[in-house]
Regions:
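Phosphate-group recognition and catalysis centered on beta-loop-alpha active-site segments
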Residues: 1-239
Length: 239
């Protein structure tokens, strides 16, 4: 099973949707861009199209000419990136067995990290065995958005959620049998990290693109950081 432990005292680098600030997201080109600048894992989204084909995209509106199928993406990592961690984020439900079997068929189980914001999906993947499993907290960034007219209410809700996140992490890990909590950077705190570590689980912060945020979550003790621009690691955590 893939390790999510820090290396050389720094969090692991996870390229978000490849490296979304450097190349088109969720594409083979994006995966190559992430590898070129240096990452420990590459993250990509998986959805089911209306024809039931599993493809690499965040949503149906994002499917285009460059969108690889899940099979094409897994073949890329099996052939062109034989030592890289593969972070598969499930945006659809109900195809867990098919996805895990495909990961297994390409010989990627030992370096796969499969995540979802859906409790049932994470629990199902964990029950299937093999791949490391993470539960995303919260399920979508819109749950904690501070934009628009509702910003004052969102901010108060965010503060409340940040306070209770340390108490939520343990039960979510227990219910899902996940071994990692994938926590939005705004909810990361030393208390949340300690709560996960007490259960033997890693903490992955998402999505961090600013050096000051990277420094903050690293200081909080997270084990890995998801970023659209992996280059920020070199400038922020060089020492």
């Amino acid at each position: 099973m893939i390790s999510l432990e820090r290396r050389a005292g720094r969090p692991l680098r996870i390229g978000h949707r490849g490296a979304a600030l450097l190349a088109p997201e969720n594409t083979i080109q994006g995966f190559r861009a992430a590898i070129e600048v240096g990452v420990d894992l590459v993250e990509f989204d998986v959805i089911q199209r209306r024809d039931r084909e599993l493809v690499v995209a965040h949503g149906l509106d994002d499917v285009g000419a460059e969108t690889p199928t899940l099979e094409e993406a897994l073949r890329f990592f099996a052939v062109e990136a034989p030592s890289l961690g593969v972070h598969v984020d499930l945006k659809s439900t109900g195809r867990e067995l098919d996805i895990v079997e495909m990961v297994r068929r390409f010989g990627l189980v030992e370096r796969a990290f499969v995540t979802s914001g859906y409790v049932g999906t994470s629990r199902t993947v964990a029950a299937l065995g093999g791949a490391r499993v993470g539960i995303t907290i919260p399920r979508t960034v819109f749950s904690i958005s501070e934009n628009g007219r509702s910003a004052p209410f969102a901010r108060s809700g965010l503060h409340a959620l940040r306070r209770v996140t340390p108490t939520l992490v343990g039960p979510l890990l227990r219910i899902t049998r996940a071994t990692a909590a994938v926590v939005h950077h705004s909810l990361v705190s030393p208390a949340t990290v300690r709560a996960a570590h007490r259960r033997g689980a890693a903490v992955v912060a998402w999505t961090v693109d600013e050096p000051d945020l990277l420094a903050r979550v690293a200081a909080a003790g997270v084990d890995a950081v998801v970023t659209n621009d992996p280059r920020i690691f070199a400038s922020t955590l060089a020492s």
